[in-house]
Amino acid sequence: MSVDTYTETTKIDKLLKKPTSHFQLSTTQLYNKILDNNEGVLTELGAVNASTGKYTGRSPKDKFFVSEPSYRDNIDWGEINQPIDEETFLKLYHKVLDYLDKKDELYVFKGYAGSDKDTMLKLTVINELAWHNLFAKNMFIRPESKEEATKIKPNFTIVSAPHFKADPEVDGTKSETFVIISFKHKVILIGGTEYAGEMKKGIFSVMNYLLPMQDIMSMHCSANVGEKGDVALFFGLSGTGKTTLSADPHRKLIGDDEHGWNKNGVFNIEGGCYAKAINLSKEKEPQIFDAIKYGAILENTVVAEDGSVDFEDNRYTENTRAAYPINHIDNIVVPSKAAHPNTIIFLTADAFGVIPPISKLNKDQAMYHFLSGFTSKLAGTERGVTEPEPSFSTCFGAPFFPLHPTVYADLLGELIDLHDVDVYLVNTGWTGGKYGVGRRISLHYTRQMVNQAISGKLKNAEYTKDSTFGLSIPVKIEDVPKTILNPINAWSDKEKYKAQAEDLIQRFEKNFEKFGEKVEHIAEKGSFNK
């Protein structure tokens, strides 16, 4: 053990043994601390609402991985996975530990990430704020008892000091905020931001490194299971309908965001859900609304003096959130794991209006679309700007994957082959024209298409290959108008459709160039018109 490692271990032990380090507090005890410390307010729903200050989302430009000899050759360095040297990290780490040692109170939670016992990550979370500790308790997997928690020897420790501000010139960061992951020292160091999601996504990034090293697929997706044990995975970026479509009263939820896929099947990495709360209503999303009760946390929502919550008010951010234990949802699998997937759904919201509402992908096409991670952003719509912008996020979650994207794509391809998984690309975006001209595909029709896919009814259906993209489109789907299945038929001007489709194909190809020679085999067989 090096001197630095010895010192940091001693400092961590000292923090954990402080009389004012509150260990494994109950929800009620944490509520009392949150309210006594003015960290949040109680709402009429029973949840507490906390403000995250000026950072109402993640700070991807302030996230670093420590460049350490045993790990540096594995990480896909670049704008997303930024390096920081070990010496710089250790100096900052010790400063943060010394800072926390001077705090009147700290909050400690021990738990797990990963509901599969063989690959479960044991965690210690040290928080400056009580509400962050409740967040950790809600989002990670909770031990059965306090006694069990005392026996946990962590594989990874989160040290969270949101009120500690870094000095970039001295500390080697880019701003006052930092999220630094060290695989050698097995720590996630967070400072300068009160956005609690950094803890959740930090551990997800760690699992996205560790699991593939054991030939286990890690995935940014939601998952559910039917009465017959049939499992479906939903991949999709923000705004594609992932949460809405995977919340099905006839299917049990495995998890809403982070999963692994090993030799036994699919398992949830988390013990909670972190749902978007903007415009939330009981009518639209009853499962999520009913989960916001005693024990849950709301982030950055607007709360009146009488405790009522206005979910439509976005004065602080569009990114309002609700964090709650998964057992706040009635319709769940316990424990949070199931068999191998039967169906994978890739969701995209195509604002260009040219991708079919549903198409069946072969393995190569699935790998291509997984690496592309396409959806559309509607930039500047509040000013009447109607030009959609394509958005590509590798693996449907580029900020969270430290290894080269082909590691994940190759694993996915192998698993699709091994378990004969049906993969569908579902467009929840526009038809009959691009945004501003066409119309949004009806949620009712999308649900019907997804339900037919998951039920297996589309497995051996009749398909036609569209001439533009080379995608396999079902000839008919029960209760869905035939006219919308092939997008060219929904456009009155066929030449405009072809021009728009060709433009999108070129954008896909340009995006794929960033992967270089490593993905030539995927582009060769999986891209459009192949």
UniProtKB/Swiss-Prot annotation:
Pathway: Carbohydrate biosynthesis; gluconeogenesis. HAMAP family: PEPCK_ATP. The gene is pckA. Pfam families: PEPCK_ATP. Its EC number is 4.1.1.49. It catalyses: oxaloacetate + ATP = phosphoenolpyruvate + ADP + CO2. It is found in: Cytoplasm. ATP binds at residues 201, 220, 236-244, 285, 321, 440-441, 446. One of its GO terms (molecular function) is ATP binding. Its main location: cytoplasm. This is Phosphoenolpyruvate carboxykinase (ATP). Binds 1 Mn(2+) ion per subunit. It is an enzyme of class 4 (lyase). Its cofactor is Mn(2+). GO terms for biological process: gluconeogenesis.
